[in-house]
Amino acid sequence: METSSISTVEDKPPQHQVFINFRGADLRRRFVSHLVTALKLNNINVFIDDYEDRGQPLDVLLKRIEESKIVLAIFSGNYTESVWCVRELEKIKDCTDEGTLVAIPIFYKLEPSTVRDLKGKFGDRFRSMAKGDERKKKWKEAFNLIPNIMGITIDKKSVESEKVNEIVKAVKTALTGIPPEGSHNAVVGALGNSNAGTSSGDKKHETFGNEQRLKDLEEKLDRDKYKGTRIIGVVGMPGIGKTTLLKELYKTWQGKFSRHALIDQIRVKSKHLELDRLPQMLLGELSKLNNPHVDNLKDPYSQLHERKVLVVLDDVSKREQIDALREILDWIKEGKEGSRVVIATSDMSLTNGLVDDTYMVQNLNHRDSLQLFHYHAFIDDQANPQKKDFMKLSEGFVHYARGHPLALKVLGGELNKKSMDHWNSKMKKLAQSPSPNIVSVFQVSYDELTTAQKDAFLDIACFRSQDKDYVESLLASSDLGSAEAMSAVKSLTDKFLINTCDGRVEMHDLLYKFSREIDLKASNQDGSRQRRLWLHQHIIKGGIINVLQNKMKAANVRGIFLDLSEVEDETSLDRDHFINMGNLRYLKFYNSHCPQECKTNNKINIPDKLKLPLKEVRCLHWLKFPLETLPNDFNPINLVDLKLPYSEMEQLWEGDKDTPCLRWVDLNHSSKLCSLSGLSKAEKLQRLNLEGCTTLKAFPHDMKKMKMLAFLNLKGCTSLESLPEMNLISLKTLTLSGCSTFKEFPLISDNIETLYLDGTAISQLPMNMEKLQRLVVLNMKDCKMLEEIPGRVGELKALQELILSDCLNLKIFPEIDISFLNILLLDGTAIEVMPQLPSVQYLCLSRNAKISCLPVGISQLSQLKWLDLKYCTSLTSVPEFPPNLQCLDAHGCSSLKTVSKPLARIMPTEQNHSTFIFTNCENLEQAAKEEITSYAQRKCQLLSYARKRYNGGLVSESLFSTCFPGCEVPSWFCHETVGSELEVKLLPHWHDKKLAGIALCAVVSCLDPQDQVSRLSVTCTFKVKDEDKSWVPYTCPVGSWTRHGGGKDKIELDHVFIGYTSCPHTIKCHEEGNSDECNPTEASLKFTVTGGTSENGKYKVLKCGLSLVYAKDKDKNSALETKYDMLIGKSFQETSEGVDGRVKKTKGKYVMPVEKNFQETTEGVDGRVKKKKKTRMDNGRPKKKQRSGRDDNQTRMQVELQEGNINSVIMHTVKNF
């Protein structure tokens, strides 16, 4: 029915009339009479059937409902005895669906659930009254919908006079939301059933998460940015919040336009109106016509051609609706600049060629989801003290909805005022079946699909998260061709019933549950509809046996998906059970609890002479298939995917069979498989997985016909000795890992990109290896017979990863230039000279007993980021490392004595994370340890400067760590103590904005020298306290060691762990809130040693230390005057700066020590650095006078500092370091 603004009814009743739907025998002389009186006293026009002449037909009452603005539906005990009441309710439901009516349900001494679910005597009376009536289904829908609207309940304890006042208040509130009739700015379609009886203030829940959505949409409509007329599409899945967003947009933007209109519920209205009424409705609103029966569409054009208009069209569902409005939309585009049109739809294809831009409404985030759910779950009880007790359960419901606003509203509403037991029960029910109110939303979109699209949607649900190509292949081999399958996937994507992400077809969890509900309902009906059997209880417990034995039901089964992990009891199949399943397309017996599918106890017993005449089957997955071959009557003519892992098969089938559609075959760990002759005609095969087929000795020569084969996995085929000569032009990945008897590798494809030959018996690579110009990864790990790498490898210009680990006889690596080689693993080889490849980023030389030193030129490998030297037991020294090195692991280099000075070059703009590990380097000399600590100090200084300069130190993260044998905290740490806990009193303003991070140190000792660990991690819990606050402890990493590749090791010596972390968030909060205040503050630190996730009691922190690291302001004298905080105990004494570089007090001012390589300075009143005429100390001895060249450098640095040339100073400083 149309809205009242364009009604043709003459002598309309008074404006905003209220219609009361009730059972007269129950309420007319009592409650309703009082209610009518109260409404009239509040100047509200009210209509009840007493006003109609006796004998008037029911159609007159239904017309009055159409003409009304608000309906009060009063449900009482005998309501369902009256067919008139129920037919009125049906009309009320239709009008609310159209958006022309506000319904307020009143439950008179009845529970809303009794009405909604037609329970008890109320339901019995309905069933008796409606028996045999064809309208029964529509009536039930009305009972299901109307009680879900927020209404008013009157129980035995209620004071009826108070409830009457409450109803009057609700009516008055609802009336304020309905625009005056004839208003040219009216919304076409009133409040509908969305928020009847709520005040505008209560609608704030509609905006949870909507602020950002509205902002993003407004950016696309921006009138300043886009001067011309602009049409925007708002798209998203059903129930995602498009209508809410558009109403909010319309409310915000309507005042910016001289003419504006919103037409909502176009999908519903189009079912009840002729399509040519849509443009009439729109023109009527824009033309300020009270009764817009516009026959000549050109008339309004001349009136409005020079006006800017805003048009919002909500819930457009079909192309015909767009076409009906096309002329007006074209006119708007050609009219005055600045007009805006917004079209909301759940079908993106409808916006193609029409809109200038599209805004896709996304799911709500977790915070907004929780707020929206809580609002509806506690709508009348937001301050409920028990609300927190429901938080954990709330998380479960929010997770279930996955950010879907309508689902959150529905679930919250269904749980409102319910007990915790009810909440728990509801969650269990949702695991089995979704809420009917959520299903109904998706059902509308599903019903509009074609039959082919419905089948595709339900099929895709069976294979969600699979590759798009795989899904399309399954669909294409069904009733659809290849083009039709791709079209079906695109159409469902456009309608937001599925989506593609990273090449996979995905489906929202709610839609997935909806699809299963559809199949479940089909299974519970007479079996005439095709269906897919999902749940094991429906398949096993009276399901599959019953279905297989019933010819009609069996013939309509489209798919069986049985999770063997859910099967508890032994089940036996008869040899003839599959005979009647002529339409079966998908048969899948799998195990969800074991991804490898290797530990399943198969409880499905199969007879030896099983009949399997499944001509239509597309996908056959059968874990641990027990027969030696597939039955003779099995016809793979339509088979696309065959997966029989851990089977007892010796061959696929006897003889040759046509397999024109077969693209994927997986027979992994079928240990008895000895022949692949059945695949001779699989010319479209793309992937073949034969991993663990230990009996397979050879490949048939017919495999050369597989020109589309791209992936071949033969890992662990220990009996395989060779491959036939062939050219598989599409082959990209070949895996022969663990084929221990495979001796000679023939080049079977020039297009291989990934080649795994690890664990084979090959002794050399093929002579024509250079043909593999697309080869990216070559893995030859554990090829013990391999003695050399041919120089021809240097011609593989695409090679990026070369793995030669544990090639025990490999002694020489050729001098080659592989320009793109990034990863080179030579661990466990006998190579004596480290190769130098300019592009290498990851170099592993661990477990090499031959290398005694590294080439000096390693410092020039600017791309090297990871150098692994573990257990290089002959290595005695290391040279200077390149500046970009992020990880050096020298664990267990027991002969290592010296390191270069400097250890590594440091760039002035250094921001890289880096870790240098020297654990169990038991012979490391003291000078080497001092260089490591000195490097750590310089690294902290430069990181503090760089991080502050380039990102403001906004990110809290671990930037540097090192560990080495030792028993002392380095002297440059200003706070230290014995033990694992450190209490520090900090000076006022310690948290100023120059604070860049914290340096931490721990000396760790092993209490049990025989203890072996695979991981050791040192962390510090940092907590700041002052007079007003106590922050939550912040955990900072100090350092760690991990034994990669498995195994354990001893950490016998005491070790020093040093770590630098950018300013923790808790300190930054302190800094931001109190940087101008002078609050004495103390910090508490506790250092802990863990073995991964839990504390390791066999390791003890002997000593620990802390320094706060500050970055110098750019307008100060020295870019590198990185200062460290000081010990309070020494800061008030007259001290001179010794070897520890600690604080000196001069004329009452604190002096911050700078890097010792600078001249000693004092700090003036203005905080700037002044040169002090005093002999500089070095290790307690007077420093010899420097040559004039160094003095000249320092003079030049001072001049450059005055001129602000910071970078130049940094470069000089790094050179001096």
Swiss-Prot record:
Keywords: Hydrolase, Leucine-rich repeat, NAD, Nucleus, Plant defense, Repeat
InterPro entries recorded: Apaf_helical, C-JID, Disease_R_plants, Leu-rich_rpt_3, LRR_dom_sf, NB-ARC, P-loop_NTPase, TIR_dom
Ranges: LRR repeats: 260-285, 436-459, 614-636, 637-659, 682-706, 708-728, 729-749, 750-774, 796-818, 819-842, 861-887
Gene Ontology process terms (BP): defense response; signal transduction
GO MF, one annotated term: NAD+ nucleosidase activity, cyclic ADP-ribose generating
Region entry Disordered, spans: 1162-1195
Domain remark from Swiss-Prot or TrEMBL: The TIR domain is a signaling domain involved in cell death induction.
Protein name: Disease resistance protein RPS4
Record organism: Arabidopsis thaliana
Recorded name of the encoding gene: RPS4
